[in-house]
Amino acid sequence: MRPFDLIRFKQSGRPITMLTAWDCLSAALVEAAGADVVLVGDSLGMVALGHATTLPVTLDQMLHHTLAVARGFTASHDQQPLLVCDLPFLSYQCGPDLAVAAAGKLLKESSAAAVKLEGADPEIVAVVDRLVRMGIPVMGHLGLTPQAVHRLGYRRQALDPVSQDRLIEQALTLEKTGCFALVLEHVPSELAARARHELGIPVIGIGAGDDCDGQVRVTADLLGLTPHQPPFSPPQLNGRQLCIEALRGWIQEHQSSSPTTAPPQAEPDC
């Protein structure tokens, strides 16, 4: 899978599916399930590393997990999902030079084929422009942007006409600058539908309604492995409880099969 395949899918009306992975086991699962795109998201900071937000995740951690995900794929290279890696907080916001170094490290040292970054302020647009000019495919991300949690929170975004027009303008700017796809998170469904019809690149939604070119979900949320799931990402099964019950069953079976009599006590030396 390559970035241009997603644009072809949009043109043909084929829905795009994108799931996250954070290690070789989760990668093997989402590949076997048939996901078009596998995102090594900085959400791994919360799913796998126990942080409260995505902000503490480092570039080295993203590289470490991307390498693990790549090792989890079993199909031939041309049959593998498109592997996209998040650029973590402050690896690209400080300017194009640092962004090229960070994105280049991820693509050179792992099997990632593209990077994803958040926002569309002028500074970010300049970063996208430089990355694209350097031959690095970029996926954009607007709406609820988790790296801006301290400024925007986890609230639904773009609720009024002015902010909606601004988001569409930002999306068009990202497309013009060279992004091959755009994630829209936690925005009104009518806004996502508008973006889908105004943009030539795929609009991939999460909490943005069904009228998108594709959908992305955090795999751990879909499997019900996390204690709490966002309202826009209901689990497909109660994986957490199933795992607990399986582990508890093994523990109880092991305990019940243990000898009921205590081993003889050793005689004291004196």
From Swiss-Prot:
It is an enzyme of class 2 (transferase). Mg(2+) binds at residues 42, 86, 118. Pfam families: Pantoate_transf. GO terms for biological process: pantothenate biosynthetic process. InterPro entries: Pantoate_hydroxy_MeTrfase, Pyrv/PenolPyrv_kinase-like_dom, Pyrv_kinase-like_dom_sf. Pathway: Cofactor biosynthesis; (R)-pantothenate biosynthesis; (R)-pantoate from 3-methyl-2-oxobutanoate: step 1/2. It comes from the Bacteria. The keyword Magnesium applies. Keywords: Cytoplasm, Magnesium, Metal-binding, Pantothenate biosynthesis, Transferase. Binds 1 Mg(2+) ion per subunit. It is found in: Cytoplasm. Transmembrane segments: none annotated. It catalyses: 3-methyl-2-oxobutanoate + (6R)-5,10-methylene-5,6,7,8-tetrahydrofolate + H2O = 2-dehydropantoate + (6S)-5,6,7,8-tetrahydrofolate. Signal peptide: none annotated. Its main location: cytoplasm. Gene3D superfamilies: Phosphoenolpyruvate-binding domains. The active site is at 185 (proton acceptor). NCBIfam families: panB, PRK00311.1. Belongs to the PanB family. This is 3-methyl-2-oxobutanoate hydroxymethyltransferase. It comes from Synechococcus sp. (strain CC9902). The lineage of its organism: Bacteria, Bacillati, Cyanobacteriota, Cyanophyceae, Synechococcales. The gene is panB.
